[in-house]
């Protein structure tokens, strides 16, 4: 039905007759000549119909937005004065000779113009129309190019694309599972996988030493801009490769993606330990485009007569750190109050500040609500440590170390955006040497990555003797403050795996009930293995400049995990529930909806 895509027609086709199909992006009648912008997934081309062919011209005059049409015409160069440099096809146009309406379009329920606003609900309800818009179509096409490039690289590197089950068993991976009732085993449930973690480890035990899969994963968790109940991972696992080798291979793949698809040279990724990232940036996924760093000042403030500073400065578990924001002294008191309120979201009890109005005037050039507690030596020490200049603002964080890191890390990001401090387009890095465990609110321990991550350089006995000192052989790839992917070396012997379960409070009976198959498999010559999983949606979001992963998924859910297009989720037929042995407990929420 067509000779090429609309967006592919160029000056090399001048003088040729082409047949194109697509949708009417815009139609206008200018002085007896109809100009038609025809659009398909590859772009837009201008078609011109004049009255010399009255039958075709009359049909062209009836066209409206989103009519689906077939066009035949002659490619001709535009005069220099009419070249449109904003269009790929802006040097040419099609002189229309034939026109067939393949399907008409009713008045549209959403605005198709990129400059017109549609609500998120409207866009998702009429997603098939929203996806026709060039900026959306471009992202979906780009996503396809990413997956093709990933497959090509991994296939060429000897990896095997192997599918793993979707109906599986619940595993403790940090979020709620989506459950699927079994008809044949009434009262029992499958779980949709949060990741293929255990199956890909079992594939290593099966001898398939290089595995990958572009796979759907499911997590029933609270949603944010970068979260969806179903999402896609680029899942990778290898045997007989160290963490350094896995990092090198996946870094090579990532650099290739950016070079091939964006012509961006990311260069070699620097490595930073978790401890250094938290100390300098207050985050385990630091945005290195932001030049601000947390600066420790507990030694300067440990003797001041101000408990807010003094107590954490002398507490082994406390921390006092500052941010020095260039030009920040221009913030008003109201704006500083907004910063303080923002810090409380992340656990801070308040926010002390110091304005450097005039460095040459000593204490007289300093403005701060806590200045009365600070002598000249302390102020000079702070100014020297932070290298503050006239016009700068110093923000103080003083509390338990984890609260200071989280609150000051959040303020660092906010200040970086507010003061336009971000420099450089792409700043990748590896974050390594994570703690094996982190404390829970009830005094227990939680695996920082997952329970199958191996510790570095210790025995099971040493791990159980002091689990909080253990460092995991884990690694995260971070780009511009976003975690692209995370992975680790896995535990490959049953003694170490059982020790980790005990530390996490998973007793032997529970471990055997949930993971007996894994513990059994570990007894039969399991090879050393390691892997990594990338968030495909997040990678495409960053590479295309989208603000949400919803804009790089064809049919995403809303922030309440619903699909306005299909009205999913919905109520099941009562007969189906009886067959499944499932009884719905009535609540006020679902009672109203069923009525």
Swiss-Prot record:
Domain of life, source organism: Bacteria
Q: Where is this region: Aspartate?
A: 197-200
* Locations listed in the record: Cytoplasm
Q: At which positions is L-aspartate bound?
A: 173, 219, 449, 490
Question: Which keywords does this chain's UniProt record carry?
Answer: Aminoacyl-tRNA synthetase, ATP-binding, Cytoplasm, Ligase, Nucleotide-binding, Protein biosynthesis
Its Gene Ontology cellular component terms are: cytoplasm
Q: Please name one Pfam family that this protein belongs to.
A: tRNA-synt_2
| GO MF entry, a single one | ATP binding
Reactions the enzyme catalyzes: tRNA(Asp) + L-aspartate + ATP = L-aspartyl-tRNA(Asp) + AMP + diphosphate
Q: What is its EC number?
A: 6.1.1.12
A Gene Ontology biological process annotation? aspartyl-tRNA aminoacylation
Detail which positions bind ATP: 219-221, 228, 483, 535-538
For this protein, the record's InterPro entries field holds:
Aa-tRNA-synt_II (IPR004364), aa-tRNA-synth_II (IPR006195), aa-tRNA-synth_II/BPL/LPL (IPR045864), Asp-tRNA-ligase_1 (IPR004524), Asp-tRNA-ligase_1_N (IPR047089), Asp/Asn-tRNA-synth_IIb (IPR002312), AspRS_core (IPR047090), GAD-like_sf (IPR004115)
Subunit-structure text: Homodimer.
Q: Which PANTHER family match?
A: ASPARTATE--TRNA LIGASE, MITOCHONDRIAL, ASPARTYL/LYSYL-TRNA SYNTHETASE
The Swiss-Prot or TrEMBL record describes its family as follows: Belongs to the class-II aminoacyl-tRNA synthetase family. Type 1 subfamily.
Functional summary from the UniProt entry = Catalyzes the attachment of L-aspartate to tRNA(Asp) in a two-step reaction: L-aspartate is first activated by ATP to form Asp-AMP and then transferred to the acceptor end of tRNA(Asp).
Name by which UniProt lists this protein: Aspartate--tRNA ligase
Its source organism is Shewanella sediminis (strain HAW-EB3)
Q: What is the lineage of its organism?
A: Bacteria, Pseudomonadati, Pseudomonadota, Gammaproteobacteria, Alteromonadales
